[in-house]
Amino acid sequence: KNKPGFDLKEGDKIVSLVSLSMTPLKIEKILSIHKDIDRVDIIGKAILFESALYCKMPEDMSEPLALAALDVAGAPAQARKLPHEGDSVLILGANGKSAVLCGYEAMKKVGPKGKVVGVVRKASQVADLMELGVYTDVIVADCTKPVDVMEAALGVNDGKEYDISICCVNIESCEMSAILPVRDDGLVYFFSMATSFTKAALGAEGIGKDVTMIVGNGYTKNHAEITLNVLRENPKLRKLFDEKYC
């Protein structure tokens, strides 16, 4: 893993892979605020500690594009690591940027005998997501209503529970929608920062689900390169990110 200063020279552009909530910042001047893409341009200083993670700004894509992808780099790297060939994977919040990156990596891992199913709230989102080719199916359900999600999800999986679910919904009370459709000994990955440990742990206990739950660790080995490679490999996803997040 990279450590600050070991392979850098003055003037290099880098992207911190540590959350801003964990990064000491001295903001000297705010230049502009981009509300539509959650970005603020500033003049200032940031402190990266010896254990901090970063990567050099890639030369083959724009800065806004790289930043948009690296913001959620942990998710697609986990989606590459967790599934196996033939698995069924359920991705909640399928329209978000972390979810489409996860879908792409999961599709590669599960292969032609597996399934990657996305869950969205609006029917109007389905056609565009299917066009991306990162899901085998996209279903419409409210992720705060776990029974609705389970019924819709099992309906496109021949009535079978899922091996893995990935929760990318950034709103509260979606824990049970990620847990309920998953089989015993399956895996639930909560990437969303809105996840409540209490709701997830007690909810799984309350319905008698013996599942492994991972709470969204943002770091996975090589996660930055894995995520940037998704945009290099998939022109449709790159176009989506360029249009929506840059």
Stretch-by-stretch model annotation:
Residues 1-20:
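Glycine-rich beta-strand-centered segment in the early N-terminal region that forms part
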Residues 6-10, 83, 182:
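Short, well-ordered loop/turn sites that connect or cap secondary structure elements
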Residues 15, 163-166:
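N-terminal Rossmann-like NAD(P) cofactor-binding module of classical short-chain dehydrogenase/reductase
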Residues 15-86:
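NAD(P)H dinucleotide-binding glycine-rich loop of Rossmann-like/cofactor-binding domains
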Residues 61-140:
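Mid-domain Rossmann-like dinucleotide-binding core that forms the NAD(H)/NADP(H) cofactor-binding site
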Residues 146-160:
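Short amphipathic alpha-helix with an adjacent loop that forms part of the alpha/beta core around
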Residues 169-234:
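Glycine-rich phosphate-binding loop and adjacent beta-alpha segment
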